[in-house]
From Swiss-Prot:
InterPro entries: aa-tRNA-synth_II/BPL/LPL, Ala-tRNA-lgiase_IIc, Ala-tRNA-ligase_IIc_anticod-bd, Ala-tRNA-synth_IIc_core, Ala-tRNA-synth_IIc_N, Ala-tRNA_ligase, Ala_tRNA_ligase_euk/bac, DHHA1_dom. It comes from Buchnera aphidicola subsp. Acyrthosiphon pisum (strain APS). The lineage of its organism: Bacteria, Pseudomonadati, Pseudomonadota, Gammaproteobacteria, Enterobacterales. The keyword Phosphoprotein does not apply. Binds 1 zinc ion per subunit. Homotetramer. This is Alanine--tRNA ligase. The gene is alaS. Consists of three domains; the N-terminal catalytic domain, the editing domain and the C-terminal C-Ala domain. The editing domain removes incorrectly charged amino acids, while the C-Ala domain, along with tRNA(Ala), serves as a bridge to cooperatively bring together the editing and aminoacylation centers thus stimulating deacylation of misacylated tRNAs. Zn(2+) binds at H564, H568, C666, H670. It comes from the Bacteria. Signal peptide: none annotated. Keywords: Aminoacyl-tRNA synthetase, ATP-binding, Cytoplasm, Ligase, Metal-binding, Nucleotide-binding, Protein biosynthesis, RNA-binding, tRNA-binding, Zinc. Its cofactor is Zn(2+).
Amino acid sequence: MKKTTDKIRQDFLKFFKEKGHMIIPSSSLVPYNDSTLLFTNAGMNQFKEIFLGEKKSNYPRVATVQRCLRTGGKHNDLENVGYTSKHHTFFEMLGNFSFGDYFKKQAIEYAWELLTSKKWFNIPQNKLWISVYKDDTETYKIWNDIIKIPSERIIRIGDKNKEKYNSENFWQMGDTGPCGPCTEIFYDYSDTMKIDPIEFLENKNGRFVEIWNIVFIEFNRISKTKIISLKNKSIDTGMGLERISAVLQNVYSNYHIDVFQKLIKNIAQLSSINNLDHISFQVIADHIRSCSYIIADNILPSNEHRGYILRRIIRRALRHGHKIGIKKNFFHKLVSSVIHVMGKTGDILKEKQEKIENVLKIEEMQFSYTLEKGLKILNSEIEKIDNNILSGKTAFYLYDTFGFPIDLTSDVCREKNIKIDYNSYELAKEKQKEQSNINKKFYKNYNNNIILNDTCIFEGYTKTITRSLVKYIFVNNQSVSKIIKDEKGVIFLDKTPFYSESGGQIGDIGQLYHKKSSFLVEKTKKYGKTIGHIGKLISGQITLNDSLFSHIDEDYRYAIQLNHSATHLLHATLRKILGDSIVQKGSLVTNTYLRFDFSYVKSIDTSQIQKIENIINTNIRNNIKIKTEELNLEEAKKKKAMALFDDQYGSIVRVVFINNFSIELCGGTHTQRTGDIGLFKIISQSSVASGIKRIEAVTGQKAIDYLHEKDNYIKDISLLLNCSTVDIKEKTKKLTIKTKNLEKKIIQLQKKENTQYIKKILKNVTEIKGTKLLTNIFYDYEQKSLRMIVDQLKKELKNTIIILINIINNRFTIIVGVTRNLLDYITAIKIMEMIINKTNGKGGGKKEIAEGGGANTKQLPSILNTIKLWINDKLNEK
């Protein structure tokens, strides 16, 4: 019986546990404290600090199954996914590591035992080939003398371009630092067992597949050509789970292993295509795995950084779904299949299934329309090509207008043997950046043009007034030594209680003053790592190095704090009522109200709004103490602190606790207890984009003012209705019924009146080659009635063109109707175009009916004659 992928994963860990290794869980796909990587792309990433000597390991030997993603930089497999049998965006890396414990001999023996012993993987020894670095004689001898691999199956790999240590079999972390030779184990898929080192090196037909790489970290690279021995030597190994599964399940393509076949069969059920080897099935199966795990690690689709990688993968999958005829939203429905096939690795997905599905569904809904439209334009442009090269300008237009990542466009072109002019694509991209910079000039004049490599100590968490020193003054973006009365500028201090606009919270206002000088702070913003106080000097003058008082407007700050703490309560409550799959998409905290945007596909009803308000106000009445702590980022994550973890945080973060109800990373200012908020009231709930909801709310006195205002509205309405406030609902219901009945009577009267008009205007019918043309001019007639007349005439007549004109105050409106049997050669929209072109009017519509209007009424008689001639010509063509 073949081993399942889940069993292979468990056997690997069991083997190394028996060999004294500590089993370490996979780290996140988002590398911790490593700005050099977008995503974790190897098992060793989480041990990088240990290999660099910056940190000591708690265990001398460990083993992991690491979730990895390769979609950018040196390791970018995205464009190959689906087209080859071995490439994936997401994969699992099996790895064992030694930190100054065992070295070459033991590492090789462990690998050989696991791969070849009957107890474990039981791969025939003669199916395995070995590569070693040309100068690593020690490793060669271990394979040859101890493991007994014939010398013909041990291939020495040299340096590229005669450059020392530049070899496939010499690993290095960077230009300098830990490095060392590696040995790779290959599986031979051939049945011939022919020993041919040349064929091995060329590997044109994919006969040999690398399954395990063992790196011997024994040197420290000082320069390009100089390396020295490390005191503590380490082992770093990596074996792709998908590749070893293909070997042990006796299939060549990774997409034929159990995990992918189950996924592909589920995808095929949504499509009319029966070929399970179809490239699109492979792409979608790969991409749903990567997207699920990326979102599980708190990355959301966006237009930059990790979020854009996620968006690119999603959109590539959606395009392949479209290609195989899946028109409805489908991608999010595959998440449950991924959880099912991934075994224990799928547990992290199970916890966040609803969130993953919602994020994918929203992204799919937002992109589906532009995908259809963009593909039509791309295919149209491809048809025009005569040199097999798509203009980079077109590729950029698709990216800029329809959100087509360049690799999506490249994917379509690849299928049609079309190349993209990447040079002109980059030029178009650069040009747009330049234009964008011009558009931002005003903003830059007030922010980015002031560049300071300095810091400012923020004391606003505990103080509202501070004695500060003036370090810099800017007026009109120029650094000056002083600012005088009535001048506007930006003042920078050594320390301040002013909170700078950040994290959705607006900046403080207040005053900087000393003696008879006073600077009114109207806005506070960040400039790099320092804080700028923007405003106007209202008296005296302020000079560099002056000592002054910086004093925030305490009422203004207090109102902001109420709204910020309420925002945290709202966020936690939304997750409680609507599900923890909701994701914050933006927020604004001001002194007058708060705004919170979040992803949610369904509508939110009144009862849910009331539940949200009730829970928040209960927490307010409970007068909970709000605490803040500075924690290590990993500690914060363990406490399940809510955060946008795709953001760049430092190693130490500030966490705001409202008991266990709300735990959130936040640098903003908050009230001391929830009771200070007083009252929370939602004033509006709306959709701001597909799948994005917005709630606006008020707190404290503003909430009371809002309720008073509503109360006054109700009293005013009761006066108008001449009833008590408790009877408003019943009185309104009766008035509504009465109004509807009156509207029905009006429509009946209009129909009678229209019938009389129709009898009159039918006398104006003229015939052109058997087709009726009915024209009539009305004066001060209701537009709605005209539409009813046109609809009625179209139902009663055949072979008829109707043109009704209504003149009001020297302006005209016009309705054109054409019966269906004439639409092949005469349309209402074409007639309307002729009218508005002659009168400089405006209009639009469809083939059967069109509406428009204008001011040039004098031209109407001659235009009607022109239309008659045009109709005559069209009927002649018929």
